[in-house]
Amino acid sequence: MPVSSYKAKQLIVMRRDLKMRKGKIAAQAGHACVEAVLMALAREDRLSDVSLSYNEDGEPVWIVVDDHGDPSPLTDGFRYGVAKVCVYVDSEEALLDIAQQGRDQGFIVSLIRDAGLTEFHGEATYTCLAFEPLRAEDIDPITGGLPLY
């Protein structure tokens, strides 16, 4: 499904300058994506308002409701798919700047700091970030100019 068909997309910003192994990149991106969604649910105390249903094809569909019992924007993301778009920056400073721009807009940003146990010579290192699932028109002003990873 092309990215333009999705109702929401989740941006992952990786630090390319770290030259992480492919498995490390996948793990760090996974941590960031999951944490950003959980943070978005917790922000409005929604963790208790999440339920699992199944569509006509037997596939799982997560339902998140708002204060009025209506599906929230996150439900559209779960129902119609959330495109994962991975872009990159080449420094910690650039990563932290993107994180701050997102926070300044009121977006949930999961900034991942690896403990350094398997890479980075034992030093804790910021590796990536992920935003909560957002509409393109909301996130593109911040990340639209970044190159795809």
What role is predicted for each listed range?
Residues M1-Y149:
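Positively charged, small/polar-rich N-terminal and surface patches that mediate targeting and assembly
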